[in-house]
Swiss-Prot record:
This is Beta-glucosidase 22. The lineage of its organism: Eukaryota, Viridiplantae, Streptophyta, Embryophyta, Tracheophyta. The active site is at residues 207, 421. The keyword Metal-binding does not apply. Glycans are attached at residues 41, 233, 238, 435. It is an enzyme of class 3 (hydrolase). It comes from Oryza sativa subsp. japonica. One of its GO terms (molecular function) is beta-D-fucosidase activity. Keywords: Disulfide bond, Glycoprotein, Glycosidase, Hydrolase, Signal. It comes from the Eukaryota. A beta-D-glucoside binds at residues 61, 161, 206-207, 350, 421, 466, 482. Belongs to the glycosyl hydrolase 1 family.
Length: 533
């Protein structure tokens, strides 16, 4: 992503969010460092026996083979083929997982990976979005699952990871239409029926909060819908309403799938259905009451937007107040359906931000999601709300993960939580050193914060590194590697090679080494510590 100059206003939130998705990186304040350092030494054995450590990928980013064996295009195929990536890359190649999955599952076993999280491509399994199942797609996922079972690797499947079938997008505008609920439920039914005898952990959607903002407010993600002044280069959309509609339909679709599973499959398959959100921890920019209120408001808009309905059956009161008639209402029947519809929640977490109030003048002109939230996001307390907005380096704050886990414990009735993405990328770099000590340091510190939250009563069930190997990164292409294993994208054979972090993770999981947080996070480090992106 190109660095831009702009004024950091509420509407800049979408841009910051996208950058965080692409290039999360280390930083931590001195206060957080001291807190994390108190965790001292730990090993795999310090975590509960049922706690799982894994790593993940997603279908479009990993599989490649986008035009093979009957797969139809997704909205990400359309987006990248239109040349909308900064480097004009596409996911056509991915990491070659469609043909190299057996090799990769062996790598997982060699790494002592306990669990693997991947997503299913809706357009590979059901190319027309509904109706006939693609035998080749079914064969691929069955074979992948069988390989994982044979290696004793716990399987975590995400049904939807941002890659909506283009054919349904063309038919009724995808998540904007309530028609998506029936089609998504029918797709999930196929997955439960065909794979549920071996899969017990199902996540319905990845990051519906990001989908709603990035694709329907700023228009940066496909299907690129927005309206001025909130987004640029969109040919259709309404940023003031559509993010709320998309989130609403996503929640209802999730609840419909959960009801299907509980009614038809759970008694025999004994599995669990949850939903995933993107999260970062929020600190008040100052001690003012306005900034403190804005910090909680930002949590409600980012986290509560999705989780309040799943746990309590309705949106946060502050969202209903700020958005008014632009946010849809749940009927009494819908509220009953969505309440308690998640057996667990998954979070993707990389960094933290500072929040200041931006409510002055918030009633002037049209309002989108970010204006309703009325909060300014900063990378650190030294940031100014002007000049270069998109930084080349982002904060690392392991304490923020602990705070988020404990917030979820206190706010959402102790619902089980999986950290489904946490990782370190070199944004803008074409190569990622095999000697990736910075990634080891990053993962060590966040794993330590996970343990600290566990010891404080957070109901955390697992931790997944993003990503198991280098993949096509959304909006960064092949130039922001996050993987534990290096992939040579210049070689048509896409050879894999374990990085230092893969060897380190393997030794930790086998109990051969411990982690000393004090050596990773020393109390005298300051809030300006960053890793290059």
């Amino acid at each position: 992503m190109a660095v831009s100059s702009s004024t950091s206003t509420c509407s800049s939130f979408s841009l910051l969010l996208l950058l965080l998705l692409l290039a999360a990186a280390p930083w931590r304040s001195g206060e957080a460092a001291a807190a994390a350092a108190r965790a001292l030494n730990f090993t795999r054995q310090d975590f509960p026996g049922e706690f799982v450590f894994g790593a993940g990928t997603s279908a479009y980013q990993y599989e490649g083979a986008t035009d093979e064996d009957g797969r139809s295009p997704s909205i990400w195929d359309t987006f990248t083929h239109a040349g909308k990536m900064p480097d004009k890359s596409t996911g056509d190649m991915g990491a070659g997982g469609y043909h190299k999955y057996k090799e990769d599952v062996k790598l997982m076993s060699d790494t002592s990976l306990e669990a693997y999280r991947f997503s299913i491509s809706w357009s590979r399994l059901i190319p027309r979005g509904r109706g006939p199942v693609n035998p080749k797609g079914l064969e691929y996922y069955n074979s992948l699952i069988d390989e994982l079972v044979e290696r004793g690797i716990e399987i975590h499947v995400t049904l939807y990871h941002l890659d909506f079938p283009q054919i349904l997008e063309d038919e009724y505008h995808g998540w904007l239409s309530p028609r998506v609920i029936d089609d998504f439920t029918a797709y999930a039914d196929v997955c439960f029926r065909e794979f549920g005898d071996r899969v017990r952990h199902w996540t319905t959607m990845d990051e519906p909060n990001v989908l709603s903002i990035a694709a329907y407010d700023s228009g940066a993600f496909p299907p690129c819908r927005c309206s001025p002044p909130f987004g640029a280069n969109c040919t259709a959309g309404n940023s003031t309403v559509e993010p709320y509609v998309v989130a609403h339909n996503s929640i209802l679709a999730h609840a419909s799938v959960t009801r299907l599973y509980r009614d038809k499959y759970q008694a025999t398959q004994e599995g669990f259905v949850g939903m995933n959100i993107y999260s970062f921890w929020n600190y008040p920019f100052s001690s003012s009451s306005a900034d403190i209120a804005a910090t909680q408001r930002a949590l409600d808009f980012m986290v509560g937007w999705i989780l309040d309905p799943l746990v309590y059956g309705d949106y946060p009161e502050i969202m209903k107040k700020k958005a008014g008639s632009r946010i849809p209402s749940f009927t009494e029947e819908q509220s009953e359906l969505i309440r308690g519809s998640a057996d667990f929640i998954g979070i993707n977490h990389y960094t933290s931000v500072y929040i200041s109030d931006a409510s002055n003048g918030e009633t002037v002109g049209p309002r989108d999601y970010s204006a309703d939230m009325a909060a300014t996001f900063r990378i650190s307390r030294n940031d100014t709300p002007s000049g270069q907005f998109v930084p080349t380096r982002l904060p690392r704050d392991p304490k923020g993960l602990q705070c988020m886990l404990e917030y979820l414990r206190d706010t959402y009735q102790g619902i089980p939580v999986y950290i489904q993405e946490n990782g370190f990328g070199h944004f803008g770099k074409d190569d990622d050193s095999l000697n990736d000590t910075d990634r080891v340091d990053y993962l060590s510190s966040y794993m330590g914060s996970t343990l600290a939250a566990l010891r404080n009563g957070a109901n955390v069930k697992g931790y997944f590194v993003w990503s198991f190997l280098d993949v096509f990164e959304l909006l960064a292409g092949y130039h922001s590697p996050f993987g534990l294993h290096y992939v040579d994208f210049e070689d048509p054979n896409l050879p894999r090679q374990p990085k230092l972090s893969a060897h380190w993770y393997s030794k930790f999981l086998r109990g051969e080494i411990g982690i000393n947080i004090e050596s990773t996070i020393s109390p005298d480090e300051h809030e300006h510590e960053h890793a290059d992106q």
